[in-house]
Amino acid sequence: MSLVSKRIRFALRLLAAGLLSASASAELRPLDDGELSAVAGQGLINLDALTYGGYEYTRLNIGGDMKLLTNIDKLRLGNFARTGSSNPSNLGTVSNQAADIAIDNFALGRVDNAGSANAQIVPFEIRDPYIELAFKNNGNGVREIAGVRLGFGRARGDLSGDIHSLTGTMEGYINGPASIALEYYKQTHSGCDFNCIALSIAGDAELYSKVQLVKEGSGDVTQNGVPINRATQIGVANGDRFHTTDAFLDGLLPLLATQGGDCKASGLPACFPLLNYKSIFVGDRLNSNLATGGAQGIFFSVQGQNVPWQDLADKSKFIQTQAGAFANFAKYTDGNKDIYPFAVALYDALRGTARVDTCIGGKGC
């Protein structure tokens, strides 16, 4: 609970500082009835209250857009020892990382032509950010803070960092021609075995799959019956498989491209270190309209117990989080279509992605 309290105090201090600076630069004056009747819109800041599953929630919504270029040397959330059976979620720990979320050189946004006089900042865009508190009565009937989260209505842009561990939901989409997979297979294997022949037959048919946080070596997404935490890899989960747009080949792929608990599919790696991906693009890279191209439902939370948070991408659902820290980059549904918060080309999935520039020339960050 002390960890939660520290995060909450920091968030409230930051919010108070922003409000004070805003009020100091604005002149307040009364409006007469005529002026009021000409005004339409909603408040910049509003509060929502919700009760669910024995929890009470208060959410402070900040209506508006933000553009960020941010660099943080070390981001650590949920930095505590996960030992003992008092917290059942400890049974899901799959690495020796010291924090639930551990990212070095964390950055939002990028800089194009960073080393030239024509350097251009391409910010990370956020719409309708919010801070939310969850409350619950303890055994003595005292109302306590159970958790706090920071989230966004929409988000779009480059996220960079050396990701050592993640806890939560990280769902993405990889796709690319089978010929890319065949080329990689030939570079990493001698001869042409059954997998090689199958990929050759597939030709340029598109392969695609969902990827998520997985346990290294097996691709499991649970351990001892609970969701994994402190994951160091992302990939095709144990039991999932690659699909293809070719109907005939898709019927054969379950025999060829299913991840069977060894982090391989069609002889190719199906689980990848998070450290391989120095930058990912959140949202739709091809749609620059934040209202339609921004990813929904993203949040970071810290809680002293397992807290269900409302999924703002689908308010009829709640996302179960473990005690500790949690990052939510989950897919959501728009009509009949699944939308993933990020997509990676098959070529990059196999080889990793380079970091985009996040500083301007010699000026530093």
What does each model-identified segment do?
Residues 51-365:
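Long, compositionally biased low-complexity segments
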Residues 1-51:
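Low-complexity repetitive segments in secreted/extracellular proteins
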